[in-house]
Every structure is written in C-alpha cells, then in structure tokens.
C-alpha cells in the first residue's frame, strides 16, 4: 500500500508593503496597519505576514506610534 503525503507546497507570502510600492508606512493609515496586528492587538511576526525585515521594522515603528497617538489599542477589548 503506497504512503500518501500530507500537506503540499506552501505558497510564498507576498510582502504587502513592497507589492503596493509603499515607501513610507504612515502611522495614520490604520487600515493598512490592521493587517499586521492580531485580534489580540499584538504585532504579527514576519513569518506570518511575509514582510521583509526592513518593512517589518517600518510597520512595527508605525504601529507603536499609532498606539501612542491613540489610533490603535495597546491590547484588545474582551
């Protein structure tokens, strides 16, 4: 009886920042930043979002600025 393989090839994640040719990640663009935050309010890692290291730093800094300005919550509401 032949063994069957589980799973398959994983699709490579696309860097959302590079794909849309965004040079500056604005902290006021909350709709864009919400793609990089979990439902608990934590910043998602590169392995989940598929961003490059450079763009991950830009996103993290923008999220932190938006939190300080009160545009994004520090933690999720229950």
UniProtKB/Swiss-Prot annotation:
Q: What is this protein called?
A: Small ribosomal subunit protein bS18
Keyword Metal-binding in annotation: no
SUPFAM superfamilies per UniProt: Ribosomal protein S18
The family annotation for this protein states: Belongs to the bacterial ribosomal protein bS18 family.
Q: Which domain of life is it from?
A: Bacteria
Q: Give GO terms for biological process.
A: translation
| HAMAP family linked | Ribosomal_bS18
As given in the record, the signal peptide range reads none
Q: What does this protein do?
A: Binds as a heterodimer with protein bS6 to the central domain of the 16S rRNA, where it helps stabilize the platform of the 30S subunit.
UniProt keyword annotations, A-Z: Ribonucleoprotein, Ribosomal protein, RNA-binding, rRNA-binding
Q: Cite the NCBIfam families for this sequence.
A: S18
* A Pfam family recorded for this sequence: Ribosomal_S18
What is an example of a GO molecular function annotated in this UniProt entry?
Answer: small ribosomal subunit rRNA binding
The record describes its quaternary structure and partners as: Part of the 30S ribosomal subunit. Forms a tight heterodimer with protein bS6.
Which species does the entry assign this protein to?
A: Lactobacillus delbrueckii subsp. bulgaricus (strain ATCC 11842 / DSM 20081 / BCRC 10696 / JCM 1002 / NBRC 13953 / NCIMB 11778 / NCTC 12712 / WDCM 00102 / Lb 14)
GO terms under cellular component: cytosolic small ribosomal subunit
Q: What InterPro entries does UniProt report for this protein, alphabetically? A: Ribosomal_bS18, Ribosomal_bS18_sf
